[in-house]
């Protein structure tokens, strides 16, 4: 999967189209990512007693995972781009690059 934790992404499809956010967590097994402030859902939690005796419950708003095909990585210029790879000469490691401008991501 070419989108990693910490990347800034732009939502290109869905109800939050046009929103930018940072990837909180990536789920490679399901090809989904959790983006900060995007795809917010309301989750109903049951009332349960905490260790201090206070009860917690009600409606909680949180982010839900979004499919990786619905987001595009934002490059250093702030434009959405596809991700490519090149091999670094001195270290021999694979480095992610922007397909639009050729710079490292």
UniProtKB/Swiss-Prot annotation:
Instruction: Note the CDD domains from the entry.
Output: KOW_RPL26 (cd06089)
Q: Which InterPro entries match?
A: KOW (IPR005824), Rib_uL2_dom2 (IPR014722), Ribosomal_uL24 (IPR003256), Ribosomal_uL24_CS (IPR005825), Ribosomal_uL24_KOW (IPR041988), Translation_prot_SH3-like_sf (IPR008991)
Q: Which PROSITE patterns match?
A: RIBOSOMAL_L24
Subunit (UniProt): Part of the 50S ribosomal subunit.
Q: Where is the composition biased (Basic residues)?
A: 94-105
Task: From the UniProt entry, list the residue stretches annotated as the region Disordered.
Answer: 75-105
Role: One of two assembly initiator proteins, it binds directly to the 5'-end of the 23S rRNA, where it nucleates assembly of the 50S subunit.
Q: Which PANTHER family match?
A: MITOCHONDRIAL RIBOSOMAL PROTEIN L24
Note one Pfam family from the annotation.
Answer: KOW
What keywords appear on the UniProt entry? Ribonucleoprotein, Ribosomal protein, RNA-binding, rRNA-binding
| GO molecular function ontology, one term from the record | rRNA binding
Q: Which family does it belong to?
A: Belongs to the universal ribosomal protein uL24 family.
GO cellular component terms, semicolon-separated: ribonucleoprotein complex; ribosome
Its source organism is Rhodococcus jostii (strain RHA1)
The name this protein goes by in its record? Large ribosomal subunit protein uL24
Q: Which SMART domains match?
A: KOW
Gene Ontology BP terms: translation
